[in-house]
Amino acid sequence: MEPVTINLEQATVRFGDKTALDNFTGEFTPGTVTALIGGDGAGKTTLLKLLAGRLRTHSGNNSGYAVDRHNVGYQPADSGVWRHLSVAENIEFVARTYGLSPDKARTRSEELLTKAGLDHVPNRLAGRLSGGMRQKLGVVLATLHQPGLVLLDEPTTGVDPISRAELWSLIAATAAEGATVIFATTYLDEAERATRLFLLDHGTLLGVGTPTK
């Protein structure tokens, strides 16, 4: 894992004449979990895609990105799994994509699947998993190659309480390994899991804080 520190200063992203992210300033550092909080259209996904290197700023003074794609783990809002593949085949595909050795992929996937409570369904098609199980598999796939930057778009949406606890165990373990973890959510109670919070609305940063402030 290569540690990732990103500083954005007055970062702006536009789509045509629409400003999706307006003068965003923030820092993201290794070993932390940052929550992007806001409703639909707040700019959370735009910011995640920017940090992932999938978008470019139209203005701003920024450092630390775009991160090499092999050092990024990204889970989109739809879980990011291939539904026509089994759990094991999803893992094999991602492992090959990032050049993991068979031994490394096996050891790492066994560890993550156990933490996610998915170790009993390796041969099940992802399309036949529950929504919560697919979300957990999405986080497993995003963190399989131990990236320095992990980006999760509403990873707990539609997830039952038990699966949510397993998800947070995965996310906390990823940060403890030294990754810079950033997740988007519409739930204020999710903020308690974060090291730092960014409140967004219509692409504008309204406030920055911690769970205790």
Name each model feature, range by range.
Residues 143-144:
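ABC ATPase C-loop
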Residues 150-154:
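Catalytic Walker B motif of ABC-type/P-loop ATPase nucleotide-binding domains
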Residues 125-132:
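Conserved ABC ATPase signature
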Residues 52:
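Helix-to-loop junction immediately C-terminal to a conserved catalytic motif
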Residues 92, 96, 103-121:
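Conserved ABC ATPase "signature" region
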Residues 37-39:
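The feature captures the beta-strand-to-loop junction immediately N-terminal to the Walker
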